[in-house]
Regions:
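Amphipathic alpha-helical packing segments from all-alpha helical-bundle domains
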Residues: 72-76, 105, 121-147, 156-171, ...
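Secondary-structure edge/capping motif, primarily at the C-terminal ends of alpha-helices
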Residues: 81-85, 110-117, 169-177
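Amphipathic alpha-helical segments used for helix-helix packing
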Residues: 103-121, 138-139, 205-211
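Hydrophobic alpha-helical connector segments
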Residues: 65, 76-108, 159-162, 186, ...
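Helix-loop "lid/cap" segments that line or gate small-molecule binding pockets
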Residues: 97-104, 112-117, 192-198
Length: 220
């Protein structure tokens, strides 16, 4: 029937779109956004360059879509981790550790998505990612304050500072080499973040015991 043919075509188009984005993500993880070129993405995805252009008229369109999908993946991971926690402070800790673990697992990709210099027209997508991260952390901070688990503070400002702390501590030029000591880095950064928010005894409370390590994290 015609509608079945239409459904099959739609599935093929969606699968090709996903393959192109997956190829771009792999390349960005290997060489950064500068390495994401139409020709290299087409070759990795097993399609012609013209096919990529049919989906994405310009390279900036491809990278903007890639940034949006990376942001969706990371925000989704934070929400799932926080949603499985028993309380607001545990949820905040879980969100911090999840972001840190995933960033360490794909450090080159994280740098490409958040901090690597890009064309001016891509700044909006990158800023949206940072704002989404800050909003997620802000929601967890607000919930913890409301239940008396954190001292009163400006949740928006605290979330912005937390986002900056994590980015600089994990993928910025001053970030330490985490090779071979990923668990230590994730726990140390989480403890630092929680202390900055007013939790001096986070380790004693067991807030960093269930650290999910980069090798254990799987993309959704």
């Amino acid at each position: 029937m015609p509608y079945r043919r239409t459904e099959n075509v739609a599935r093929r188009l969606a699968a090709r779109h996903d393959a192109i984005i997956a190829a771009a993500r792999q390349i960005a993880g290997e060489g950064g956004m500068a390495a994401v070129q139409i020709a290299s993405v087409a070759a990795r995805a097993g399609v012609a360059a013209g096919t990529v252009y049919r989906y994405f008229p310009a390279k900036t369109d491809l990278i903007a879509t890639l940034l949006e999908e990376i942001a969706e993946d990371e925000i989704g991971a934070l929400r799932r981790a926080a949603g499985g926690a028993p309380g607001p402070l545990s949820a905040l800790s879980a969100a911090i550790m999840t972001f840190a673990a995933r960033a360490l697992r794909e450090r080159r990709l994280a740098f490409a998505a958040i901090a690597e210099p890009v064309d001016a027209e891509l700044d909006a997508a990158r800023l949206a990612f940072r704002r989404s991260l800050a909003a997620e952390f802000g929601a967890r901070i607000t919930a913890a304050i409301a239940e008396g688990r954190l001292p009163e503070q400006d949740a928006g400002m605290a979330a912005a500072a937390l986002t900056g702390l994590l980015i600089e501590g994990l993928i910025g030029p001053l970030a330490p080499d985490a090779s071979g000591r990923e668990r230590e880095v994730v726990q140390s950064l989480t403890l630092t973040a929680l202390r900055a928010l007013g939790v001096a005894d986070a380790r004693a409370r067991g807030l960093v015991v269930q650290t999910v390590m980069p090798a254990d994290v799987r993309a959704p």
